[in-house]
Amino acid sequence: SRLMAIGTFAQLKTAAANWLDRSDLTDRIPEFITLAEARFNRLLRIRDMETVSTAITTTAGTREYNLPTGYVQMKEFHLSTDPITSLAYITPEMMSRLWAGSGTGKPQVYTIIADKVRLGPSPADAYTTSMLYYKAFTALSDSATTNDMLTNNPDIYLYGVLLEAEPFLMNDQRVQLWATAFRQAITDVQDQDNKDRHS
C-alpha cells in the first residue's frame, strides 16, 4: 500500500483506518481523534499553542471575567497601561485572603477560578488587558479540516489516534509500539520548541 499524506481530517481518518486494519472500528475513528486531541492538549505547551487576547476590558467594580475559548494555561497577563502593569498570579486562597473586601483600585494580581480570571483589587476603572496564553488546538472536524498540529506534527495525531483505539485491540502487539512512538513524538516536539526559545 502506498504512503499517503496526512494533512486533513479526512486523510487522518483514512490513515488511521489503514493502520488499524479493522473495518469494525472505522466509525469510531472520529472519537479516537477527539481523545487524542484531549491527550496532547494536556501534554504540550509549545509556541503553536500561544495566542494573545486583548478581548477583556475591565469594568469598574467587576473583578471576574470569562477566559477565552480554548484557554489551557496563562503565560503572561498585563494591563495595557503606560508603562504596562504586569499582573502576578496568586492562588485562589491568597486572593480570598488579600482581596475579599469591596475595595477597588488598579489590579495588581490575578487568579484563575474555573473558567474565569479574577482580578485583585477589583478594578476602579476601565483597563484594556493583554493576555498571552496557551490555547488548545482547534479540534478537527468536517468543517475544521486541519490545524497547526496536524500540519506540523501528523505523527502525533496518527499515533495518538491509534493509541486511543487500544481498548478495542486486545493483546495487539502494535499498541506498545504506538505508545512509544507517541511519547517520543511528544517529547521531540516539546524539546525542539524549548531549544528554539533559547537559540
What is each stretch, according to the model?
Residues 2-199:
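Glycine-enriched, solvent-exposed interface loops adjoining structured elements
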